[in-house]
């Protein structure tokens, strides 16, 4: 905790390396802000922290073009590039272009991203129906601070997931604030079990022949199967989806957008409704995917921004739903939150920094889900440094998610496969009630599948020129089954929505 606070303070003391086209601008807008014009360039170390991903290090740069400033704080063009890695072996390599001027009267966004993830979170299907037990993966060098008897592996709730994404989206105007949207892209998932030898590094797993105990207690035992491997053995994850696949997609929908700006609106409504058709090929590293993995999903999102006092106090909330309406989506795509425009490095749901802060990343995995985020955004101080405009804000928030389309589990097959696994591999197979919630009759409990997952917290925002927002969020889950830790911090760029 002490290291994290030192890290946050260090970041807050950093000022961007900033260069701009030299134009003496004296105009101010209706809120008294000095208007920016021309090209503005900002570069920063890509440093951050995520409760699920660890500390992040790298570099990022953002170029904005404001033209004559008549639309400020809206930009005409934005070019964003980032390369970074985290201490939990999660990588970000991304280039994004966003423009309202390249094609007259249209908005065009192009994004190319590669995200290697050596320890992607996997907590099973259907939320609370799947048991989360912190003792199974929590390791501490002090044995008194961990459950030695229950401990399995730090990778018990993990699998390896590398993702390549390319997306091109365009928006045009139908009438006033009503827009049409279309997009295409491809998602390439390369999936496997965690590479334990790589994760162990120099801490090789070896057994002392005299004591029969590991010579290095921190080293993970590669013989222990995590939840992902168990789901494959028991048939919950089909072999055709177990190793990933490549998925081209087409998207079309409608948008209503009356917001007065994109990054931090002070008033207005944003709503979208769209369909995404996704195909499947090259699953399992070259094998043809089953036709059933072609699927159609529907998304609806509603955001509302209400000014309670000028631009200093804003009540903002977001409601959303994502459902599968035809075909079958592979398990790894059910944690991908579809969006009309790619603005963040990753859209994952439900759980984690991009959906439900304070709840573990991908804790709620189902065929369909709904969510809500509520924030009270305040600007407590405004000031200038040179020609740059800054503000400091605070934003208490509440996040909620529910399952709308659960997985239909074949309970008889699961029990048969588990019994077979228990007989063949008793040392590394736990009782069924360590994986699923069971009722008094020993059947998988259905009663809590639709129960809400909730979290709350507080955000600190430091913004430059309205569009460049440095964010520090603290959050905690309201149920320990979603996260046993209370100190969950997320240091990112921008608002959640």
Q: Locations of the language-model features?
A:
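Residues that define the transmembrane beta-barrel architecture of outer-membrane proteins
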Residues: 39-41, 53-57, 75-77, 89-93, ...
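Short loop/turn motifs that connect adjacent beta-strands in outer-membrane beta-barrel proteins
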Residues: 21-22, 26-40, 67-76, 102-108, ...
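Transmembrane beta-strands of outer-membrane beta-barrel pores
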Residues: 49-51, 63-65, 83-89, 99-101, ...
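Transmembrane beta-strand segments of outer-membrane beta-barrel domains in Gram-negative
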Residues: 22-23, 27-29, 111-113, 120-311
């Amino acid at each position: 905790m002490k290291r994290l606070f030192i890290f946050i303070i260090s970041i807050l003391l950093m000022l961007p390396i900033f260069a701009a086209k030299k134009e003496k601008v004296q105009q101010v807008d209706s809120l008294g802000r000095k208007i920016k014009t021309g090209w503005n360039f900002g570069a920063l170390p890509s440093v951050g922290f995520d409760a699920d991903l660890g500390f992040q290090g790298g570099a990022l740069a953002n170029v904005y073009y404001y033209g004559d400033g008549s639309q400020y704080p809206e930009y005409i063009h934005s070019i964003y590039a980032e390369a970074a890695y985290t201490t939990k072996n999660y990588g970000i390599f991304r280039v994004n272009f966003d423009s309202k001027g390249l094609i007259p009267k249209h908005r065009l966004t192009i994004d190319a991203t590669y995200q290697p993830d050596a320890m992607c979170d996997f907590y099973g299907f259907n939320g609370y129906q799947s048991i989360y037990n912190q003792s199974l993966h929590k390791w501490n060098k002090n044995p008194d601070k961990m459950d030695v008897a229950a401990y399995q592996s730090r990778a018990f709730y993990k699998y390896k997931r590398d993702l390549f994404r390319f997306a091109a989206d365009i928006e045009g105007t139908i009438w006033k604030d009503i827009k049409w949207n279309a997009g295409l892209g491809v998602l390439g998932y390369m999936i496997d079990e965690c590479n334990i030898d790589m994760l162990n590094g120099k801490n090789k797993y070896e057994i002392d022949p005299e004591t029969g105990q590991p010579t290095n207690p921190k080293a993970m035992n590669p013989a222990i199967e995590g939840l992902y491997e168990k789901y494959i053995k028991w048939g919950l994850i089909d072999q055709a989806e177990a190793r990933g696949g490549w998925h081209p997609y087409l998207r079309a929908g409608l948008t209503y957008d009356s917001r007065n700006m994109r990054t931090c609106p002070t008033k207005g409504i944003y709503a979208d409704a769209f369909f995404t058709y996704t195909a499947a090929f090259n699953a399992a590293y070259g094998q043809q995917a089953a036709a059933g993995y072609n699927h159609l999903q529907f998304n609806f999102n509603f955001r509302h921004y209400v000014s309670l006092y000028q631009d200093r106090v804003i009540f903002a909330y977001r409601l959303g739903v994502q459902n599968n309406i035809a075909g079958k989506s592979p398990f790894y795509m059910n944690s991908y939150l579809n969006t009309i425009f790619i603005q963040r490095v990753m859209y994952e749901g439900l759980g984690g920094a991009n959906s439900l802060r304070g709840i573990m990343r991908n804790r709620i995995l189902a065929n369909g889900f709904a969510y809500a985020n509520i924030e009270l955004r305040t600007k407590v101080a405004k000031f200038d440094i040179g020609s740059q405009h800054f503000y400091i804000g605070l934003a208490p928030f509440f996040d909620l998610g529910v399952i709308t389309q659960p997985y239909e589990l074949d309970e008889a097959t699961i029990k048969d496969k588990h019994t077979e696994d228990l007989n063949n591999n008793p040392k590394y197979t736990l009782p069924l009630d360590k994986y699923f919630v069971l009722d008094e009759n020993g059947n998988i409990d259905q009663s809590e599948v639709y129960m809400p997952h909730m979290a709350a917290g507080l955000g600190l925002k430091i913004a430059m020129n309205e569009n460049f927002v440095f964010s520090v969020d603290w959050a905690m889950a309201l149920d320990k089954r979603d996260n046993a830790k209370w100190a969950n911090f997320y240091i990112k760029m921008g608002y959640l929505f």
